[in-house]
From Swiss-Prot:
Organism classification: Eukaryota, Fungi, Dikarya, Ascomycota, Taphrinomycotina
Effects seen without this gene: Normal vegetative cell population growth. Simultaneous knockout of wtf15, wtf14 and wtf7 results in normal spore viability.
Keywords tagged on the record: Meiosis, Membrane, Transmembrane, Transmembrane helix
UniProt gene name: wtf11
Membrane topology: Multi-pass membrane protein
Cited InterPro entries: WTF (IPR004982)
Name of this protein: Wtf element wtf11
Biased composition (Polar residues): 1-12
Function noted in UniProt: May act in meiotic drive.
Keyword RNA-binding carried by entry: no
Keyword Lyase: no
Residue numbers spanned by region Disordered: 1-26
Main location: membrane
Length: 264
């Protein structure tokens, strides 16, 4: 009768047998001269022993903690219900607010609009000159040159900042239409302002003669037209910005100036 006998061997006996056959030291024996093997410190790797088998036995999977920490960090930084994979990268964002003139509008169209506004500006100045019976021959060379340079500067500004001023005009017109109830009061204040300006200019002409009036007529017409437009816009957008107190102060200043001129 044959019996299958299997000897009972422990894991320690198997390791000792493998050492004796292969001549490999698994690092389980303690060297009395060197002492105990250094303990592996995960925070400071200076204590890592040279034997890789010992480090494997102390910390079987050193990447386990790193993966867990990385997963926890990503989970904490990711908001609930938000998928970062669908969000576009920040580097793709382009800031178009710094653009002054975009290529969406043809350059020829921008030039035509700008030159039309410059022509209107020149026609207003020419009309003021004709109103005061001043022809182009009466202007000096420097006056003509300054007029030409001012027209070129206006053309350059209108073309360079086309997107800016067109958007501002559109928003302003929309806002004025929303405030259409304030337009009658704005027209009334503009009318009062021009009446006061007329009497002021008439008083200055009477005090200093026609020569003073002819010299300042162009400036007076342009300045009063510009100020009238600004007063209308301010009063339409914000009623009371050019209030009665402001007009009263101007009247007091004009009366005080006329009294001083009469004394002289």
């Amino acid at each position: 009768m044959n019996s299958n006998y299997v000897p009972l061997t422990s894991s320690v006996d198997v390791e000792e047998k493998m050492e004796s056959e292969n001549g490999v030291d698994l690092g389980n024996d303690i060297d009395l001269e060197k002492g105990l093997p250094l303990k592996y410190n995960s925070e400071n790797e200076s204590g890592l022993p040279s034997n890789s088998a010992s480090s494997y036995l102390i910390n079987p999977d050193p990447t386990m903690d790193l993966e867990a920490q990385t997963f926890n960090h990503n989970e904490s930084t990711t908001s609930v219900g938000h998928d970062n994979s669908n969000s576009p990268p920040k580097c793709r964002k382009t800031c178009s607010s710094n653009k002054v003139y975009s290529n969406e509008v043809p350059l020829l169209f921008v030039f035509v609009i700008s030159i039309s506004i410059v022509c209107i500006f020149d026609l207003v100045i020419f009309g003021c000159l004709q109103y005061n019976m001043v022809s182009m021959d009466d202007l000096h060379v420097m006056q003509r040159l300054s007029w030409f340079c001012a027209s070129l500067a206006l053309l350059f500004i209108l073309m360079r900042y086309y997107d800016f001023w067109t958007k501002a005009c559109k928003d302003g017109i929309k806002h004025i239409f929303k405030k259409w109830k304030n337009t009658p009061l704005a027209f009334l204040q503009v009318l009062i302002f021009n009446i006061i300006g007329f009497f002021v200019r008439k008083g200055l002409k009477d005090s200093f003669g026609e020569q003073w009036g002819l010299k300042t007529s162009l400036f007076a017409h342009v300045s009063f037209a510009t100020m009238s437009i600004f007063i209308f816009i301010f009063e339409t957008l914000k009623p009371g910005s050019c209030s009665v107190d402001w007009i009263a102060r101007i009247l007091k200043a004009v009366v005080y100036f006329l009294e001083d001129s009469d004394e002289l």
